[in-house]
């Protein structure tokens, strides 16, 4: 069994999925993953579907140099955003796989959320391109390893109402005692 970057606190209430050596851009996939981290599973799947339809965009926060601006980034408080279709499709596939794994474990699909998602760089695939004057340059791709864990949300237990402890000074205690004596 492969090791994951994060260990779940309750393995019985979580399901995982991973993809290794995927030929998809590391930078785009990292931004896609961070966009849905911590989201409910159904909400994340719907969002990624909207990204493919160009109705919403993926905010680019780290790898955002030379990226154009779009108004769709305002939703996340950024100006730079894109619609990385290939990355979205790979992440969608892993979300679907994790949902199937959760269903096999008997978890409630409506309570699942993305508790951990991580994208790592895989070894680069090297090719070459031929340039003018007999030169050769490298032509590399940046594949990714993606891992994600979906966890069932625990129902919040209502906190018991605290009794407010009133601290009285000796003068206040004396006054209350005097009032009780008068009333009795």
From Swiss-Prot:
GO biological process terms, semicolon-separated: cleavage in ITS2 between 5.8S rRNA and LSU-rRNA of tricistronic rRNA transcript (SSU-rRNA, 5.8S rRNA, LSU-rRNA); cytoplasmic translation
Residues bearing PTM Phosphothreonine: 70
Keywords annotated in UniProt: Cytoplasm, Isopeptide bond, Phosphoprotein, Ribonucleoprotein, Ribosomal protein, Ubl conjugation
Covalent link (Glycyl lysine isopeptide (Lys-Gly) (interchain with G-Cter in ubiquitin)) residue numbers: 46
Gene Ontology CC terms, in alphabetical order: cytoplasm; cytosol; cytosolic large ribosomal subunit; preribosome, large subunit precursor
Any Pfam family: Ribosomal_L22
PROSITE patterns in the cross-refs: RIBOSOMAL_L22 (PS00464)
Subcellular location: Cytoplasm
InterPro entries for this protein: Ribosomal_uL22, Ribosomal_uL22_CS, Ribosomal_uL22_euk/arc, Ribosomal_uL22_sf
GO molecular function terms attached to this record: structural constituent of ribosome
Job description of the protein: Component of the ribosome, a large ribonucleoprotein complex responsible for the synthesis of proteins in the cell. The small ribosomal subunit (SSU) binds messenger RNAs (mRNAs) and translates the encoded message by selecting cognate aminoacyl-transfer RNA (tRNA) molecules. The large subunit (LSU) contains the ribosomal catalytic site termed the peptidyl transferase center (PTC), which catalyzes the formation of peptide bonds, thereby polymerizing the amino acids delivered by tRNAs into a polypeptide chain.
Misc. comment: There are 2 genes for uL22 in yeast.
UniProt-listed PANTHER family: 60S RIBOSOMAL PROTEIN L17
Quaternary state and interactors: Component of the large ribosomal subunit (LSU). Mature yeast ribosomes consist of a small (40S) and a large (60S) subunit. The 40S small subunit contains 1 molecule of ribosomal RNA (18S rRNA) and 33 different proteins (encoded by 57 genes). The large 60S subunit contains 3 rRNA molecules (25S, 5.8S and 5S rRNA) and 46 different proteins (encoded by 81 genes). uL22 is associated with the polypeptide exit tunnel.
UniProt record similarity statement: Belongs to the universal ribosomal protein uL22 family.
Annotated protein name in UniProt: Large ribosomal subunit protein uL22A
Species: Saccharomyces cerevisiae (strain ATCC 204508 / S288c)
Gene that produces this protein: RPL17A
């Amino acid at each position: 069994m492969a090791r994951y970057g994060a260990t779940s606190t309750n393995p019985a209430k979580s399901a995982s999925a991973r993809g290794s050596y995927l030929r998809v851009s590391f930078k785009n996939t990292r931004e896609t993953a961070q966009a849905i981290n911590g989201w409910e599973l159904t909400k994340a799947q719907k969002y990624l579907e909207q990204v493919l339809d160009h109705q919403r965009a993926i905010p680019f926060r780290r790898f955002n140099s030379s990226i154009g601006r779009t108004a769709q980034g305002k939703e996340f408080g950024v100006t730079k955003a894109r619609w990385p279709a290939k990355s979205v499709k790979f992440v969608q596939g892993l979300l679907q796989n994790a949902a199937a794994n959760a269903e096999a474990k008997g978890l409630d699909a409506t309570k699942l959320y993305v508790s951990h998602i991580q994208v790592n760089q895989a070894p680069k695939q090297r090719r070459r391109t031929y340039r003018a004057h007999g030169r050769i340059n490298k032509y590399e791709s940046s594949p990714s390893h993606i891992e994600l864990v979906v966890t069932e949300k625990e129902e919040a237990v209502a906190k018991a109402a605290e009794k407010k402890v009133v601290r009285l000074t000796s003068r206040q205690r004396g006054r209350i005692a005097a009032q009780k004596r008068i009333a009795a």
